[in-house]
């Protein structure tokens, strides 16, 4: 707020306010030589206002935990789970009869497992999976204050599930030549509950070609996209420095 007060009157922002803060915490515990746990948390809040009638706010929240397990001298596993949240809101009250609040938020939940398997002194296999569930509030427009005549409008919420499995091979063939190859198989599914339009066969999507409205129940897989992703790279050292 102090910085805003230093601005010239003609800037139009002299009566504005701004502020932010962040909180973070990490807890790590080693149970023994084979098992350890890390827990992480983060929260941030930002606010800004050009004046008392126009305000903006943002919030971020992250929380996760990771378990490290050494199964043997050649196999190590990392198991993680977490939650991410972001929200935004804008309040406009210059005109009491048209005052509104606009808000949006997204939530993500994930689990993943990563493994490192040392096949030989210079040959390592990496594999695992990750799955993430998305909950998205695409937008809410609503009246701000009892005098507002704004009509509330809420966009449909979106839910989706994204999952991927991967396998990678790192091999140092010689001190000069190494190869890294891998494959990742990804799946993305749109989930209910949600209503969507059905269009006339062979016609472009348009209001005039809508033939029906389909309602998918909670948790129903409406559409799934999937496919492999390949990766191949090589490194060759011509000299010790190049």
For each feature predicted by the language model, list its residue ranges.
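Transmembrane beta-barrel wall of Gram-negative outer-membrane proteins
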Residues: 12-47, 55-77, 81-83, 119-120
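Signature of Gram-negative outer-membrane beta-barrel scaffolds
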Residues: 126-242
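Short sequence motifs at beta-strands and strand-loop junctions characteristic
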Residues: 15-19, 55-59, 101-107, 155-161, ...
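Transmembrane beta-strands of outer-membrane beta-barrel pores
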Residues: 1-2, 43-47, 83-87, 131-137, ...
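Residue-level detector of the transmembrane beta-barrel scaffold of outer-membrane proteins
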Residues: 3, 26, 36-40, 76-80, ...
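Extracellular loop and loop/strand-boundary signature of outer-membrane beta-barrel proteins
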Residues: 9-13, 48-54, 62-66, 94-103, ...
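Hydrophobic, lipid-facing positions within transmembrane beta-strands of outer-membrane proteins
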Residues: 21-25, 41, 59-65, 81, ...
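Strand-connecting loop/turn motifs
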Residues: 32-34, 72-74, 120-124, 174-176, ...
């Amino acid at each position: 707020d102090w910085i805003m007060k230093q601005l010239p009157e003609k800037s139009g922002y002299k009566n504005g306010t701004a502020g932010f803060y962040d909180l973070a915490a990490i807890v790590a515990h080693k149970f023994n030589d084979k098992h350890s746990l890390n827990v992480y948390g983060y929260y941030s809040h930002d606010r800004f206002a050009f004046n008392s009638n126009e305000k903006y706010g943002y919030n971020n929240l992250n929380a996760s935990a990771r378990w490290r397990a050494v199964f043997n001298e050649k196999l190590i596993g990392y198991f993680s789970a977490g939650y991410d949240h972001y929200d935004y809101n804008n309040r406009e009250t210059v005109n009491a009869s048209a005052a509104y609040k606009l808000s949006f938020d997204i939530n993500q939940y994930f689990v993943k497992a990563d493994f490192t398997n040392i096949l030989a002194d210079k040959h390592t296999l990496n594999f695992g999976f990750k799955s993430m569930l998305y909950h998205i509030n695409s937008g809410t427009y609503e009246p701000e204050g009892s005098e507002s005549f704004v009509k509330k409008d809420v966009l449909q919420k979106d839910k989706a599930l994204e999952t991927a499995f991967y396998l990678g091979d790192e091999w140092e063939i010689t001190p000069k030549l190494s190869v890294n190859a891998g494959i990742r198989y990804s799946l993305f599914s749109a989930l209910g509950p949600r209503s969507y339009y059905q269009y006339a066969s062979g016609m472009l999507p348009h209001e005039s070609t809508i033939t029906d409205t389909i309602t998918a129940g909670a948790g129903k897989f409406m559409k799934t996209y999937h496919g492999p992703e390949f990766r191949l790279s090589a490194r060759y050292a011509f000299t010790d420095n190049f």
